[in-house]
Amino acid sequence: MARQFDTLDSDALRYHSEGRPGKIGIEPTKPAQTQQDLALAYSPGVAAPARAIAADPADAYRYTGKGNLVAVVSNGSAVLGLGNIGPLAAKPVMEGKSMLFKRFAGIDAFDIEVDETDPEKIIGVVKAIAPTFGGINLEDIKAPECFRIDERLRAELDIPVIHDDQHGTAIIVSAAVINGAKIAGKEVAKLRVVVNGAGAAAIACARMFLTLGIPRGQIVLCDSRGVVTRYREGLTPQKEEFATSRRLASLAEALHGADLFVGVSVADALTPSMVRTMAENPMVLALANPDPEIAYGAAMRSRPDIIFATGRSDYPNQVTNVLGFPFLFRGALDVRAAPINDAMN
């Protein structure tokens, strides 16, 4: 296994460094070959659209690329599977996100890495650059700060804002749960659910499960300290939403008889013995990246009736936000939706 990941690492480093470094670039959308082209593109012709936009800001969507441009904003404080690696180390991830916007939805995206941890300052930065963009994609900002940043920007900006770790993950995981339940022959509303991880993605998934009809009492949330219960002190408001009254101490205890495991946490958090205690036809969504909560081979060997998915593209049943966020933003940009609400999700 170590050799496999060593090979993947070397391949990835070569992929990113060969030719022009990185994964995104800028290409002109209008001709710039002649003196007349340049006169129209910049001085003096550019004054005409500038005056039009000053008179009517909506004309920015007619004369500029604003309506097809998204900012991918991160401070690198909570990169899935990598943790707090900071803004510079997060840049390859955000460039990758920008590339996926272009590849799957034709959306231009700039990665904006912000060297800041104060939520109010991040909010200020995003609001200051918002006139440039048709939408804002918040990415890999740690909880609980991310909740405040997301809520404020969604309320205060007139363009669509998505914290993809929350809303994008919840959409795709919910789709996987609906389809997995069909395969397992189970009703979604009767699923007994364990979510491992209590950050932005976990809370958003749990909230979305409520909209699918799963009762709050059937959802157990686990974090690095074990099961999130009502008897624990110091819970964040978001964790309090899903604190269980059941006397459970560990992930292993919570999984006894569970129908669904959703992992948005860390590698190796789940063991084959835990999987074997789950209900018939268990759904295991091990979504930590780059390494899932349980390795693919170990999961498949744990029991023959498992329905297993990861966040990786090199294994079957990939559950990844790329199945959702490009198309959600495509629709939101096309109709200038703000904000993006639960019904759209």
Please tell me what each predicted stretch does:
Residues 111, 137-140, 161-164, 195, ...:
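General beta-strand structural signal in soluble alpha/beta enzymes
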Residues 1-159:
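N-terminal ligand-binding/catalytic initiation module
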Residues 240-307, 312-316:
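Rossmann-like adenosine-cofactor binding region
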Residues 6-11, 280, 336-345:
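Glycine-rich phosphate/adenylate-binding loop
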